[in-house]
Amino acid sequence: MPFAPSLLSSSSSVSQFLPRFPNATRFNVTPRSRAATVVAASVTDLAGVDSTTIAVLGGGSVAALAAMVSLTDPERRRKLQAEEVGGGDKEVVREYFNSTGFERWRKIYGETDEVNRVQKDIRLGHAKTVENTMLMLTEDRSLAGVTVCDAGCGTGLLSIPLAKEGAIVSASDISAAMVAEAEMKAKAQLPSENLPKFEVNDLESLTGKYDTVVCLDVLIHYPQNKADGMIAHLASLAEKRVILSFAPKTFYYDILKRIGELFPGPSKATRAYLHSEADVERALGKVGWKISKRGLTTTQFYFSRLIEAVPM
């Protein structure tokens, strides 16, 4: 991670966004030549974390644990678990987020204190991504009357703020449990005329046309060859803007992901795919879109690249 980024920048001006982030977190990486100053959480903490969660380490600690990757076979473990629920990644993700994953992530995305320190940190990171997304969407225009597709809406953490700003929101998720939770929360916070339209659906099956399509922290479930097609599909639904967030692929993050796979648990049936910004930009370019704004959210245990794309 050879950077200490601001949370949001644009291709035209970086500084214009910085005053809007008084609490922006800058992530400074410990040089490899120094002893580790960022230590992994306890195994007790990590046991409750998904394969999408990476234990952040430094220096020799990373090298030592990275060597352990060859002693385990997380891919074989995932394959066996996948066979139990019918095969491919989509079925695994659907099953996971309708069962143990739903309970875990409902706590992380909620306000309960029944989470460990790693999960609290992830909660903070995802909340920052939602905040930064809302800033991208409202920086230079009102959302009143704007049609927005929230693809992979989870428990409604973005859908509800969008509706509060006057957007006409269509929200979907592969998990029926997540959609039910999002709908319940929306009804408690919004008047009936402003409620998003919720549906259970996977990304591949989404149809329609929207001013803006948003897909946050979902591409982590897609390998790059499938992510290219998914990005193209999402762009085909959008008229003006596409906003995506994804776990950035770097050598350091890739090692940390592999370390995270060493810790057993039911969530390891779900694969966690990292994506390079260049690959995402290339996929957008192939279908006539270009990146207009870029952002990055980082906490100790959460990192997510955020981009806004517009037609060329």
UniProtKB/Swiss-Prot annotation:
PANTHER family: METHYLTRANSFERASE, UBIQUINONE BIOSYNTHESIS O-METHYLTRANSFERASE, MITOCHONDRIAL
Name under which the protein is recorded: Magnesium protoporphyrin IX methyltransferase, chloroplastic
Main location (coarse class): plastid
GO molecular function, one term: magnesium protoporphyrin IX methyltransferase activity
SUPFAM superfamilies cross-referenced by the UniProt entry: S-adenosyl-L-methionine-dependent methyltransferases
Source species: Arabidopsis thaliana
Known catalytic reactions: Mg-protoporphyrin IX + S-adenosyl-L-methionine = Mg-protoporphyrin IX 13-monomethyl ester + S-adenosyl-L-homocysteine
GO cellular component terms, semicolon-separated: chloroplast; chloroplast envelope; chloroplast membrane; chloroplast thylakoid; chloroplast thylakoid membrane; cytosol
Gene3D superfamilies the record matches: Vaccinia Virus protein VP39
Family according to the record: Belongs to the class I-like SAM-binding methyltransferase superfamily. Magnesium protoporphyrin O-methyltransferase family.
